[in-house]
Amino acid sequence: MTDSDHRLPDRPGEGDPGRGRRIGIDVGCVRVGVATSDPDGVLATPVETVRREKSSDRHVRRLAQLVTELEAVEVVVGLPRTLADRTGPAAHDAIDVAEALARRIAPVPVRMADERLTTVSAQRSLREAGVRAKGQRAMIDQVAAVGILQSWLDQRRAALAAPGEGGHG
């Protein structure tokens, strides 16, 4: 059993690096969705979808490049825990990508955020917006990354506004 068997999501606001862009990442089997925030951490927007390479770390290199290009102060990777709050294969995969990315971008912190049902929510949003199923595949990972990051930003703002909570703000 590894540490990742019991990996729980991080809490927004703890060890907060202060003002600056954040990057949200949705790790999938085939693609990785990427989103970013404005420097004030108010709004998440899609950036790109990175093709996943199981046989190489090309996707991790691209993610690290985006962190540098966007001058991110924090990275938030979705942790897809099961509905029973367990760590399944998808969560182990996300943790592996997060750890590989953290090694490349240190000292920029990489956090894990609870992302149960974000892909389902993203699919529903795209369907309601009239995007056909074929078109959804190209966008779904970015929309899920936006959902992960926006949730983190909202929770961070609330944590930093609470008395005695958070970091620099």
From Swiss-Prot:
CDD domains (alphabetical): YqgF (cd16964)
SMART domains: YqgFc
Region (Disordered), start-end ranges: 1-22
Gene3D superfamilies for this protein: YqgF/RNase H-like domain
EC identifiers of the protein: 3.1.-.-
A Pfam family hit: RuvX
Biased amino acid composition, Basic and acidic residues: 1-19
UniProt keyword list: Cytoplasm, Hydrolase, Nuclease, Ribosome biogenesis
Full protein name: Putative pre-16S rRNA nuclease
Organism, as annotated: Mycobacterium sp. (strain JLS)
